[in-house]
Design a protein with these regions (language model features):
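Membrane-interface loop-to-helix entry segments
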Residues: 181-196, 269-290, 324, 328
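Membrane-interfacial alpha-helical segments at the cytosolic side of multi-pass membrane proteins
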Residues: 198-205, 279-297, 332-343
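Transmembrane alpha-helix/helix-exit interface in multi-pass inner-membrane proteins
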Residues: 139-155, 223-250
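Aromatic-anchored segments of alpha-helical transmembrane domains
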Residues: 74-82, 134-136, 224-231, 307-317
Length: 374
C-alpha cells in the first residue's frame, strides 16, 4: 500500500503563502520563527483585499501574541481541571469557560473589525476582554486549585529552601515580630494591590505610546498567567499554616494587618505561593520603569517603586505567606517576562506595521464632538 506524501495534503496556494511568511519572518529576525504559528501575517495586502476577507480570517490575521497567550492560558487551565482529581471540577470548568468566552467575544468583535479597533469602543472592549478574564481567573483559583489537586507541597518546598539556603526567613524573623513591625510590613503588603491598580490603569487608560502599552500588557499578562499555571504544579499553603507550631510570636497589628488578613481570607487562592506574585508583579514594574527611564514619569517613579518593591518582598516572608524559594521564583519570573516582552513586542510591532495590520493597542481616546458642537 502506497503512502501519500504529507505535502500533498496541503493546498498549493497555502504552501506558497506559508513559504512567503517564513521568508519574511526569517528576514526580520530568526527569533520570529518561534512565533510564526501565532501571527499568520503571510503577506501585506491592500485595503480593498483586507475588507473582502471573511470575518474569521480577519480575526485570525489580526490576532496578537498576547491574544494567543491568553487563549493558551485558559485552555491549559481547563485541561488541568478536566484531568484533575479534586472536587467541584464541573463548576470550575464552567467558570473557565465563561472567562474564555469573555476573551473571545472581545477578540471576535475587535480583531474581527466589527467595530474599528482604533475607536474608543474598540480600544475599551479589547482592554476589558483581556484583563477582566485574567482577574476573574485569579479569584476563581480558590476553587480551581483544589479541583485540580488536593495535594500541598509545603514539606518539599521547605526542604528545598533548607538545602539551598539553610535559612527560612519566616522562622528566623520570628523574634522581630511586634505589632509595630507587623503593621509596617502589612502596609507595604497591602500597597501591592494599589500599585497593581495604579500601574495597570495608567498604562491601559492613560498612556499614548502604542509600543509601550503593548510591552507592558504582554509582560504583566505573562507574569500572571505563568504564575497561575505554576500554582497548579507546585501548590502549597505557606509557612503561616504549615509552620504554625514553630512560631513563638503571634502576628498582630492595626488597620493594615487586619486589611491584609481579611483580603487574603476573602479573595486569596490559599495555595498560591510558588512563585510569589507579590514579588513578581512589583519587580516587573520596577524593571519596566528602569528600562524606560527615558520617560520622565518612569524615571521619577523608579526610586519609589524600587523601595516599595523591596518592602513588599520582605513583607511576604515576614508575614509568613511565602518561603524564600517562592521569592526567588518570583524574581526569576519577573525578569524573564520583562525581557521576553521587549523581544516579542519589538518583533511583533515591526511585523504588524510592515504588513498593514493595526497596532496591538490603540490609545484610549474619548470620541470627539463634531465641529458644529459646543
Amino acid at each position: 500500500m502506497s503512502k501519500r506524501n504529507p505535502e500533498s495534503l496541503f493546498h498549493a496556494s497555502f504552501k506558497r503563502a506559508m513559504g512567503r511568511a517564513a521568508e519574511r519572518l526569517a528576514a526580520l529576525d530568526p527569533f520570529a520563527r518561534t512565533w510564526s504559528f501565532a501571527l499568520p501575517l503571510a503577506a501585506p495586502i491592500d485595503a480593498k483585499a483586507r475588507e473582502s476577507l471573511p470575518w474569521s480570517k480577519r480575526i485570525y490575521r489580526n490576532l496578537a501574541a498576547q491574544d494567543w497567550l491568553l487563549t493558551f492560558y485558559f485552555v491549559a487551565l481547563g485541561l488541568a481541571v478536566v484531568f484533575g482529581s479534586g472536587p467541584n471540577r464541573g463548576m470550575s470548568l464552567l467558570r473557565i469557560g465563561v472567562d474564555l468566552a469573555i476573551l473571545w467575544t472581545g477578540l471576535a468583535v475587535v480583531r474581527g473589525e466589527r467595530i474599528r479597533p482604533e475607536s474608543f469602543a474598540g480600544s475599551l472592549i479589547y482592554r476589558l476582554s483581556l484583563f477582566a478574564p485574567v482577574l476573574l481567573s485569579y479569584v476563581q483559583l480558590r476553587e480551581i486549585l483544589p479541583a485540580v489537586s488536593s495535594r500541598a507541597l509545603d514539606a518539599e518546598i521547605l526542604e528545598l529552601d533548607r538545602r539551598l539556603f539553610d535559612f527560612e526567613p519566616a522562622i528566623a524573623w520570628d523574634p522581630l515580630v511586634t505589632p509595630a513591625t507587623t503593621e509596617w510590613f502589612s502596609f507595604f503588603y497591602f500597597s501591592y494591590f494599589g500599585l497593581l491598580m495604579i500601574f495597570c490603569l495608567a498604562f491601559l487608560l492613560v498612556a499614548r505610546d502604542k509600543v509601550l502599552i503593548a510591552r507592558f500588557s504582554f509582560g504583566i499578562l505573562a507574569v500572571f498567567c505563568t504564575a497561575h499555571l505554576v500554582y497548579m504544579l507546585v501548590p502549597g499553603y505557606g509557612p503561616y499554616k504549615y509552620l504554625a507550631g514553630s512560631f513563638q510570636n503571634e502576628l498582630s497589628g492595626g488597620f493594615f494587618w487586619r486589611a491584609v488578613w481579611d483580603t487574603v481570607q476573602a479573595g486569596g487562592a490559599m495555595k498560591d505561593i510558588f512563585p510569589s506574585l507579590h514579588t513578581a508583579a512589583p519587580t516587573f514594574f520596577t524593571l519596566f520603569a528602569w528600562t524606560h527611564r527615558d520617560r520622565l514619569i518612569l524615571r521619577l517613579s523608579f526610586p519609589v517603586l524600587a523601595f516599595f518593591t523591596s518592602q513588599i518582598i520582605l513583607a511576604t516572608m515576614f508575614l509568613r505567606w511565602h518561603y524564600l524559594i517562592d521569592i526567588v521564583a518570583g524574581l526569576t519570573l519577573a525578569s524573564c517576562a520583562h525581557l521576553f516582552s521587549l523581544r516579542v513586542q519589538a518583533w511583533e510591532s515591526a511585523l504588524r506595521a510592515r504588513n498593514g495590520v493595526s497596532a496591538v493597542f490603540a490609545p484610549l481616546e474619548l470620541p470627539r464632538l463634531g465641529r458644529g458642537s459646543r
